[in-house]
């Protein structure tokens, strides 16, 4: 049988309540799954966006025409902006966890893939019909921002 002093050393002076607080703090540090997911996606896409911008500055400058280089840089710029937007989605998922934050996150990812992706491919391949696909990615960006705003409004 343990003495009171031994239990206090193990559980703290509040016993089980202290354990619950400790467990709760660990849960808060870990965050909710969607918050972590959006933050991780944002960081990974940010790495890719910065790499794409650096590749344009150092690897593509001598290989692409000025017009195609500008197209690539536009793709990288919007890629980075919306990777940052995913960090805002992570915050919104923490603050106002609702379906609109999830929708915003997926729309931003779709926008990066369609808008920036089509421009990346267009700039290096010259496939002109990709220019017709690009605005669909822009619509995803717009819908993502509208969804994020609605999530905040709804609270």
Question: Regions from the language model: what does each represent?
Answer:
Residues 1-8:
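Extreme N-terminal basic, low-complexity initiation segments
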Residues 16, 25:
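Short polybasic linear motifs
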Residues 20-22:
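Short, low-complexity S/T/E/D/G/P-rich linear segments that nucleate or cap local secondary structure
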Residues 27-155:
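Polytopic transmembrane helical bundles with strong interfacial aromatic enrichment
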